[in-house]
From Swiss-Prot:
It comes from Methylobacterium nodulans (strain LMG 21967 / CNCM I-2342 / ORS 2060). PROSITE patterns: RIBOSOMAL_L22. Part of the 50S ribosomal subunit. This protein binds specifically to 23S rRNA; its binding is stimulated by other ribosomal proteins, e.g. L4, L17, and L20. It is important during the early stages of 50S assembly. It makes multiple contacts with different domains of the 23S rRNA in the assembled 50S subunit and ribosome. The gene is rplV. InterPro entries: Ribosomal_uL22, Ribosomal_uL22_bac/chlpt-type, Ribosomal_uL22_bac/org-type, Ribosomal_uL22_CS, Ribosomal_uL22_sf. GO terms for biological process: translation. GO terms for cellular component: cytosolic large ribosomal subunit. Keywords: Ribonucleoprotein, Ribosomal protein, RNA-binding, rRNA-binding. GO terms for molecular function: rRNA binding; structural constituent of ribosome. Belongs to the universal ribosomal protein uL22 family. Pfam families: Ribosomal_L22. The lineage of its organism: Bacteria, Pseudomonadati, Pseudomonadota, Alphaproteobacteria, Hyphomicrobiales. This is Large ribosomal subunit protein uL22.
């Protein structure tokens, strides 16, 4: 009914990457997103490398994409990057049927999620 919201423009010192339709529930994905939020990218990559969560591989790919976007598209220094935002959104939910005893049936819900990672260049000020 109203105006469509304009896409948020990123500042010059930020870059982002989005992974859509990840086959995991938003709740499980958010556990891994919280793991990297606010950390330097080198530390975040190391944490994801040794995480036991299955979805950590996909989160690592998305973070590497954000780092590459920062380096190639925005000319930012990789050593000064920090994960500013890592947030999760719901995508669609596939509904499946599972036959049960006595002629009954049950619904199986297979959720998908979206992941957005924003990295920011934070320069250390010389005193």
């Amino acid at each position: 009914m109203g105006k469509a919201a304009a896409p948020r423009a990123l500042p010059e010192n930020e870059a982002k990457a989005v992974a859509r339709m990840l086959r995991v529930s938003p709740q499980k994905l958010n556990l891994v997103a919280q793991l990297i939020r606010g950390k330097k990218v080198a530390t975040a990559l190391a944490d994801l490398q040794f995480s036991q969560k299955r979805i950590a591989v996909e989160v690592k790919k998305c973070l590497e994409s954000a780092i590459a976007n920062a380096e190639n598209n925005h000319d930012l220094d990789v050593d000064d990057l920090v994960v500013k935002e890592a947030y999760v959104g719901k995508a669609l939910v596939l509904k499946r049927f599972h036959a049960r005893a006595r002629g009954r049936g049950a619904r199986i819900l297979k959720p998908f999620s979206n992941l957005t990672i924003v990295v920011r260049e934070v320069r250390a000020e010389a005193a």
